[in-house]
């Protein structure tokens, strides 16, 4: 199953967090990665870190503000992407919060996201973007 949360405004991270709680309540193993938020930036991070331990990663540098920040953001996104590929082998559901923002900003490449989609399908995993 692939779930997509997108659009302007609030609620996407809350929806992803809700899906995480639902899945954990059903006994599923979940990993939750954030592409843009840095560690300690948002309130949900404390609980997700407690619940998920190493299966939670806030690997971003904050939201992209200037073009000259793009290379550092790209490097951080690649670290989250590598982590996500590893997690996909171990979990039932992988949540990749802000992945579509990173894609739209050119920090992630379309082929990289398509590769994750293909891997999730092949492994019969739940993927939340």
Regions found by a protein language model. Give the residues of each.
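Phosphate-binding/switch loop-helix module in NTP-utilizing enzymes
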Residues: 66-121
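A short helix->loop->beta-strand "cap" motif at the edges of active sites that frequently abuts
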Residues: 28, 122-125
């Amino acid at each position: 199953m692939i779930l997509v949360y997108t659009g302007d405004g609030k609620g996407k991270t809350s929806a992803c967090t809700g899906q995480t709680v639902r899945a954990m309540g059903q006994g599923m193993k979940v990993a939750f990665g954030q592409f843009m938020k840095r560690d300690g930036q948002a309130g949900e991070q404390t609980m997700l870190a407690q619940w998920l331990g190493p299966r939670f990663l806030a690997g971003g540098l904050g939201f992209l503000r200037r073009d000259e920040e793009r290379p550092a953001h790209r490097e951080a996104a690649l670290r989250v992407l590598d982590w996500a590929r590893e997690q996909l082998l171990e979990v039932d559901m992988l949540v990749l919060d802000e992945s579509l923002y990173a894609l739209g900003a050119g920090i992630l490449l379309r082929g990289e996201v398509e590769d994750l989609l293909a891997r999730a399908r092949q492994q019969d995993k739940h993927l939340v973007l």
